[in-house]
Structures are given as C-alpha cells and as structure tokens.
C-alpha cells in the first residue's frame, strides 16, 4: 500500500512491480515487507528482492571483469523501523532540523530500501565510502556508465535534487528492469520525470482507444 492519495503509475501498478515509485510523495506502509534474498556478492546488508539480487550479482561480476575492481554492498533492504531509526539519528546529528535531515535521509516509508529494490554500493579498498567521492573511483565511474545494462539506475544524480528531493548519491542504485533502465538512461531523466511521461502516454493511448 501507499500512504499517498495517488497510486503508482502504469505499466506496473502493484507494489511488487519493479517500477514502483517511492519518494516523499509516494510512500510505503509500515507493514510492507518484501520477499528478499541475500545477493551472492561481497559486502554487508546484501538483502534484495530476488530479481534485483540476481541482476546485482551480474553487475558486480561484470565490473570486476571489465574494470578490474571489486564492488561491495553497503546497505540493501531496510525495514520501516530501521529507516525510522536512521532518520531519527540523522535528525539528532543536525540539531533537530527536519529540513536538513530530509536532504540526506528518507523518512520512514519514503525509502526505496524498504522496497528491496535499492542498494548502496562501494568499492573495496576505497576510502571514498558513501560520499560524492565515490563517483571519482574506478568502480563508481563504471557504475554510472554501465548500471543500466543490468536493469539499474543511479537514482539520485547531480542536478536532479529539485525533482528527486534528495542530494546527489552516486552510490545508490535502484533496480527497475532492463527496459525501463535503458529508457531512462537514454533520456537522461530521473524516475519521477519518466513516470510522469508514462502517465501522459497512458492517457493519450486511452484517448485514442476511445
């Protein structure tokens, strides 16, 4: 379920679809718990939905073969309560400012990690961690250029902050499936814009059918 009065947009309407949009407007209920598996890759907190985990394994293997670096998982699936704890900790660290906390951490129910379709990734033996410097690593650069080939998108890109609502995160990949990942990559648009375009196309198609 989503707590927003609006529902997700065609072509995949159910919350288990890979194109389910989650942000500050479209939220997930507290009791939603997806089926997840442990991706067979290096790192911690490796849980993702099965289709996303399989794609992640392929992507990590390709990065090792093509770029010669080992990617590691940092944070995959998170429960509603886990996200709540993370948000509250960030809130404390910024002196209680919700505006500042919202720039960096999703509120509970507004995190793609609860879907089981997102993963924060890093590069082994790199000091960049989950910072903008990850984009300058060999692994980060490879991810930016190639993740779409495996059905992933870089969800929060630089320059899209006003649309996505979140700061630049070169380490955060979201699984949407091959077709949609390629389309978003070629159009160079955030998921919100892509979904809006889909909505408009669906409306046009319905008018034509009438």
Positions of predicted regions on the chain:
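Extracytoplasmic cell-surface/polysaccharide-interacting catalytic and binding patches
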Residues: 1-76, 80-210
């Amino acid at each position: 379920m989503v707590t927003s009065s609006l529902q997700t947009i065609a072509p995949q309407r159910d919350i288990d679809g890979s194109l389910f949009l989650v942000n500050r407007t479209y939220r997930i209920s507290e009791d939603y718990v997806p089926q997840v598996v442990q991706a067979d890759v290096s790192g911690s907190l490796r849980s993702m939905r099965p289709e996303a985990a399989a794609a992640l394994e392929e992507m990590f293997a390709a990065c090792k073969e093509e770029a010669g670096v080992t990617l590691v998982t940092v944070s995959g699936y998170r429960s509603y309560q886990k996200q709540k704890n993370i948000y509250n900790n960030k809130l404390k660290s910024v002196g209680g400012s919700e505006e500042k906390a919202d720039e960096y951490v999703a509120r509970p129910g507004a995190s793609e990690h609860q879907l089981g379709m997102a993963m924060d990734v890093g590069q082994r033996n790199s000091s960049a961690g989950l910072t903008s410097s990850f984009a300058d690593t060999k692994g980060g650069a490879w991810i930016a250029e190639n993740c779409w080939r495996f059905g992933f998108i870089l969800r929060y890109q630089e320059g899209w902050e006003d649309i996505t609502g979140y700061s630049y995160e070169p380490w955060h990949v979201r699984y949407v499936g091959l077709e949609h990942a390629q389309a978003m990559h070629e159009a160079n648009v955030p998921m919100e814009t892509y979904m809006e375009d889909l909505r408009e196309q669906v409306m046009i198609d319905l008018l034509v059918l009438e």
